[in-house]
Regions:
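Nucleotide-activated donor-dependent transferases that construct or modify glycoconjugates
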Residues: 1-11
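Short beta-strand/turn micro-motifs composed of small residues
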Residues: 6-7, 36-40, 111
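Short N-terminal binding/cap micro-motifs at the start of the first secondary-structure element
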Residues: 12-16, 44-45
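Short amphipathic alpha-helix
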Residues: 15-26
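N-terminal cationic-hydrophobic initiation segments that often serve targeting/anchoring roles
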Residues: 26-27, 46
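Short active-site oxyanion
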Residues: 29-35, 104-108
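Conserved nucleotide-sugar phosphate-binding/catalytic loop shared by glycosyltransferases and other
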Residues: 32-89
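Conserved nucleotide-sugar donor-interacting segment of glycosyltransferase catalytic cores
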Residues: 95-122
């Protein structure tokens, strides 16, 4: 079984939460293949998963909010980032759907926040 997790790259909380779920799955089903699709860094994911093997497909599924500083949001930059995401998402979804089909067998999609994950599952 392939587990494909679309994870928001906006902050480490999403990655930590998904890692906890997937680590619990791996403990019960160690032969399952774990794939993390996220813009989170490989270093962060390696730390979160430890010795549990996983694959990282570097995809950005959402923008969250672009920070102006530690406490503020840069609304214009967030809107620009969202427009760019909406422009490239159709190609990304098509490419990831094709990749998933090439893997053969069943796949379970998990999404932590990105609504576009539902389009990939369709």
């Amino acid at each position: 079984m392939l587990i494909y997790a679309c994870v928001s790259g906006h902050g480490y909380g999403h990655g930590s939460r998904v890692a906890s779920v997937l680590l619990a799955l791996a403990a019960r089903q160690p032969h399952w293949r774990l794939v993390i699709s996220s813009s989170l860094s490989a270093e962060f994911l390696s730390g979160a998963f430890g010795a549990v093997p996983f694959e990282h497909r570097r995809c950005g599924w959402d923008v969250g909010a672009v920070q102006a500083n530690a406490l503020g949001i840069d609304a214009p930059a967030t809107l620009l980032a969202l427009a760019e995401l909406e422009r490239r998402l159709p190609d990304q979804i098509a490419a990831e759907a094709s990749w998933l089909a090439e893997q053969g067998g069943r796949a379970l999609l998990l999404g932590d926040v990105p609504p576009a994950a539902a389009s990939l599952a369709a």
